[in-house]
UniProtKB/Swiss-Prot annotation:
This is DEP domain-containing protein 7. InterPro entries: DEP_dom, WH-like_DNA-bd_sf, WH_DNA-bd_sf. Residues 37-127 form the DEP domain. CDD domains: DEP_DEPDC4 (cd04446), RhoGAP_BRCC3-like (cd04405). Transmembrane segments: none annotated. Belongs to the DEPDC7 family. It comes from Macaca fascicularis (Crab-eating macaque). One of its GO terms (biological process) is intracellular signal transduction.
Amino acid sequence: MRGLCEFYWQEFGIKGFSVAQKPFGATYVWSSIINTLQTQVEVKKRRHRLKRHNDCFVGSEAVDVIFSHLIQNKYFGDVDIPRAKVVRVCQALMDYKVFEAIPTKVFGKDKKPTFEDSSCSLYRFTTIPNQDSQLGKENKLCSPSRYADALFKSSDIKSASLEDLWENLSLKPANSPHVNISATLSPQVINEVWQEETIGRLLQLVDLPLLDSLLKQQEAVPKVPQSKRQSDMVNSSNYLDRGILKAYSDSQEDEWLSAAIDCLEYLPDQMVVEISRSFPEQPDRTDLVKELLFDAIGRYYSSREPLLNHLSDVHNGIAELLVNGKTEIALEATQLLLKLLDFQNREEFRRLLYFMAVAANPSEFKLQKESDNRMVVKRIFSKAIVDNKNLSKGKTDLLVLFLMDHQKDVFKIPGTLHKIVSVKLMAIQNGRDPNRDAGYIYCQRIDQRDYSNNTQKTTKDELLNLLKTIDEDSKLSAKEKKKLLGQFYKCHPDIFIEHFGD
């Protein structure tokens, strides 16, 4: 922990603390980061590398949580913090055993534990033994204070690597740093702010002819996400069939099968029973199993309501951005659109999109003999994602393929939204008007003198550019150029003389 503290003092800065207070301040900050991660990131049973692991969280969600926490508490003042630097903070926490990556091997060798900002990378919090207890007693999950205490007392931890990391982060300390110890806001208020600002940011990126759909979305009461998803299958008489399918998937080192079995959780019991009872007698015929699973998943999603059936006007806006080659803006707009999904639909869509991306891989199981896997997946699942009558088939296909190609990124939360939400939450928390420092500024009020000066300067600059364009246009004949220059001199002689001289 000593390395973490020095790291924090040097680059993130807590100059408001005296020398005697520095250990307390640094301990508080790091404990706060760890506590926020432990309490806000979603921990549940997940699949990773064809195996199922308990109590895991997603790398991209960890970045989202810490990113929001750092900005909201203004540990670094108003400086912009890139998402990449938050990823490196997560790497530092992983290096110090706050959490660990799910063990993976690449070609039989242990993979270097590098933190990944991805919805496909999973991590779990570490445990440390109670030093006062005897051998054999159960380990407990570290509380933030236990982490700080254990890391401070550890003589094995070297601070050099962390100090180098903090130096490379290049974050200057705030002039008036402030450790926020005020009461936290309720989850309901936080979710309402997230929804309001998400919609506001979406309006900035996408041109909408009508605001009805967004206003209806804003009127809906946001649901507070549950920490763990309660399964309704436990008491089902068909739970055994689901268990058999999961056991089969776990026994096969096949990413395709793993992604497909994950999707079965959302299929009705009757379909799952049919799949289980229709399994081929030869267990090694994975081609028949994949054909069975793909057909069942395709049939189910072709007969249910599309997962992105909300905000149809936004679909058109995103598709238009893609047509115009504005991929980065389209990606952020898509991230905002998916942020408006409730947790259950968001998780279901994430699993389906992951399965689609895996199944569309040309090196995977051939879905149809004379068709490309990518086109088959698009055709089967397009209506399961978007069924918008106002969206042409070409734009629908473009949108679906874009989602498949960027399935690892579309569920991340944009950094711009993080900052805007954090500023507003901080204002609410401190009792200020949350709309005073709004994140979306469409115009700025200026006095008449500044307006007049700006108008004259802008007009003059544009006229000079026009004159320069006429003078340097090689496509104009000498006669045409002389005529245009004469007209310009007649209307704006002062600018003409300024450019050409007397």
